[in-house]
Amino acid sequence: MIFTILVCFFAGMGAGIGTGFAGMSAAAVISPMLITFLGMDPYMAVGIALSSDVLASAVSAYTYGKNKNLDVKNGLIMMVSVLAFTVVGSYVSSLVPSTTMGNFSVFMTFLLGIKFIVKPVMTTKEAMEKVSPKKRAVQSLICGVMIGFICGFIGAGGGMMMLLILTSVLGYELKTAVGTSVFIMTFTAFTGAVSHFAIGGMPNIAVWILCIVFTLLWARIAAVFANKATPKTLNRTTGVILVVLGIVVMAFSILN
């Protein structure tokens, strides 16, 4: 039991810090750890990870929103298209072998981390506001469709995809990008978790609750810190966290 608690603690810690700082999906960290150390069925592990994502993302989104780092309007547009296509992607993924799914998102986490360290996102809120609302709405819709399908297919909350697209394609400032990403992820992860449990049955309750609690705790700590940090510090910290988590999770995949 102590071993299980420790696995859940570190899985929750990695996932929570990743969520609070970078809007990363808990699925990227929790799933591989539960599969590697507790020998859990991959589909169930993703279900637990997604449900851990829900509260962690919600508390992070609340923290970012309170600090005015959240674009609700375009977030909602993107969310609707993400949700619709997550279902499509999820169905397609149930027809594909499970190993191909996780590795892609982990590798992407690692590359994105390097990007933040080498080429930080230094966009300001003023620059963001120059884009016309109509153009931004259309961009949000199209990007949402792409993200949704890929999320559903890979079984990750798509935090990394959203962060990449919000900062690179839509030109968001980093804090607003993370805030908007965790806001959307609250809903995508909820939908994903419900559909996973509906298809795969209920998970191991102890592991499920432990992962949710630890992820929530660390996400709150990370989000509070991230909102106080300067853009430069935040870029570097986010980059380092993503690179470290990417390497750790890739190591688990190799162990497996």
Walk through the language-model features, giving the residues of each.
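Membrane-embedded alpha-helical segments of transport systems
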Residues: 51-59, 84-88, 92, 183-191
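Membrane-interface alpha-helices at helix entry/exit sites of multi-pass transporters
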Residues: 40-48, 73-74, 171-182
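Transmembrane helix-bundle signature of multi-pass membrane transporters/permeases
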Residues: 16, 46-54, 178-189, 242
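Juxtamembrane transmembrane-helix boundary motif
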Residues: 1-17, 31-37, 42, 63-149, ...
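A small-residue-rich subset of transmembrane alpha-helices
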Residues: 52, 180-197, 206-219
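Short, structured loop/turn "capping" segments at alpha-beta junctions
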Residues: 124-125, 156-161, 172-176
